[in-house]
A protein has these predicted regions:
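Hydrophobic ligand-binding cavity/cleft-lining segments
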Residues: 1-38
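Hydrophobic-ligand-binding modules of eukaryotic lipid transfer/binding families
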Residues: 1-9, 57-58, 88-91, 120, ...
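A generic structural signal for alpha-helix starts
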Residues: 12-15, 76, 117
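Hydrophobic alpha-helical core bundles mediating ligand binding, dimerization, or RNAP-core interactions
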Residues: 21, 31, 98, 118-119
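Short coil-to-beta transition motif at edge beta-strands of beta-rich domains
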Residues: 40-46
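Hydrophobic-ligand binding "helix-grip"
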Residues: 49-93, 99-102, 128-129
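A conserved amphipathic terminal alpha-helix motif
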Residues: 99-132
Length: 132
């Protein structure tokens, strides 16, 4: 299993950060790595990359303004994502951790760097959207 973590302080209050991060049907308006999202149910959604590669997410924990967790699955990997949100006045600290298992042995050496790249891009896009 590969674990990747990113922590960042965002210059926006926790209510805005939470609203944007959990509003998955609007991801394509601010995330540069996605073409669209599809809401399956209250607890499940699918993200499509710009190359139309699908990943299914199943929400497992929602503690408003504190914690969001989900399971992830696609043809290359499965795993679990944990996001914590901490208010500090008009700023919010986010702490996102992914635990991923590659389904194909030849992908294992690349998983950590791929996850880190994805996390960095997500946070960059989020900050650009919220801090504009």
């Amino acid at each position: 299993m590969t674990v990747s973590n990113i922590k960042e302080v965002i210059n926006s209050d926790i209510y805005k950060v939470w609203e944007v991060v959990l509003n998955v049907d609007k991801y394509n308006t601010w995330r540069s790595d996605l073409s669209k999202t599809e809401i399956i149910s209250e607890k499940q959604f699918i993200e499509y990359t710009n190359e139309n590669y699908a990943t299914t997410f199943t929400v497992t924990v929602v503690k408003p303004y504190k914690r969001w967790e989900f399971d992830m699955d696609n043809s290359n990997m499965n795993g679990h994502w944990i996001g914590t949100f901490t208010s500090n006045g008009n700023q919010t600290e986010i702490d996102f951790t992914e635990h991923v298992i590659a389904k194909k042995w030849f992908m294992k050496p690349f998983v950590k760097s791929y996850l880190k790249k994805q996390q960095i891009q997500f946070v960059k896009d989020l900050k650009n959207f919220l801090e504009q």
